[in-house]
């Protein structure tokens, strides 16, 4: 460490380094060694929740805990402090005559943020707080910087996102939210595994973007001297596995899209995609509803949930409505009727629906009407199905009306949570759809993809009728933690 760096330190940091040096002089490693604890704060609080001060005195139970020193008070020969571990905090009561003079000095000189190991007797104070009466203190690790806003938690939004470690230390609500996120992902896996799905891994680096309509991140592979893209979906590789006979597969992983950022979008996000042979989009609706209701029940319990003051009846059967019917209900316009592109464009102009250059079919305009008028009305869980074929290049056409596909999206609180369909397994039709997407790309549609000839070739070997699904896990985490911004459910969101 240079003298220049030492001079830049503030007074608190200098004092902490002096204490670090003093520990070394005493033969104590400032950054500790392995420590065996017998209990966490949560285990102790649960085990002794119904024990009185007298009960604990009689049973003389001992415990060894470890964690970060969060508060400390007292002077002279007696001190109180709170130790924080992954499950919460527990108070320690330290007396000089119980731990000895030398050991008491370790406690006395410990700074907030230091890690301590505490061995002692479980007790309850006169105020009724469960505590550990220390018989020995072990220094485990020195914190060379003071914690932010000692008693009130970290509140600066920029710091919360840039320095998540400080947020987790200071804000228990934030810590618990990310524990819930992990539980959500674990329960998704549990549900999928119990329903016979096999978890697999597919490449993050692709030669061609595909499986979704999105702008990719482009990178360069130096060894092979080729440009590659970060995946915008896992779909096409997973469906190759269906061709290969795996029948039920899923992947939970990061997806990368080089697009805008807002309260519900981050350039990298987590999704689950799943594919089931011999199923159609109706089966996948049932699967989607099952996943979300299972996870919600496990994490939040039975009954509806509350999101930002609105009751969401996530425990009840989800509504199912065709896109054309949804548009008709809100606008009165009936797109079931056959009409020319010019007639549809006139209706769009009449209703002030923005039209893009690549909206070259009635299907594009139906989708634009839906996005303009319907999405913001979908509060309760709703499956919207029957998307136009032009905006669904990987979905199978509907047998009854081939203008539309056997596709659905799940909306809750006006946001899309899932996208799924009966997969297109006709390689000739698939090639035609890819070529239409390539044409749209040439007309300025940045989200359109090119032709994946390798995938078309895979389909030519035969893929069974298949249903597929994608769920945005980050949005589901937002819903189940009552959070309004995606950054609050991403440990390390993208920052400038």
Swiss-Prot record:
GO molecular function: ATP binding; catalytic activity, acting on a protein; lysine-tRNA ligase activity; magnesium ion binding; transferase activity; tRNA binding
GO biological process: lysyl-tRNA aminoacylation
One Pfam family here: tRNA_anti-codon
Needed cofactors: Mg(2+)
CDD domains linked to this entry: LysRS_core, LysRS_N
Record-linked SUPFAM superfamilies: Class II aaRS and biotin synthetases (SSF55681), Nucleic acid-binding proteins (SSF50249)
Record carries keyword Cell membrane: no
UniProt keyword list: Aminoacyl-tRNA synthetase, ATP-binding, Cytoplasm, Ligase, Magnesium, Metal-binding, Nucleotide-binding, Protein biosynthesis
Principal location listed in the UniProt entry: cytoplasm
Record HAMAP family: Lys_tRNA_synth_class2
Family: Belongs to the class-II aminoacyl-tRNA synthetase family.
Protein name: Lysine--tRNA ligase
Natural source organism: Streptococcus agalactiae serotype V (strain ATCC BAA-611 / 2603 V/R)
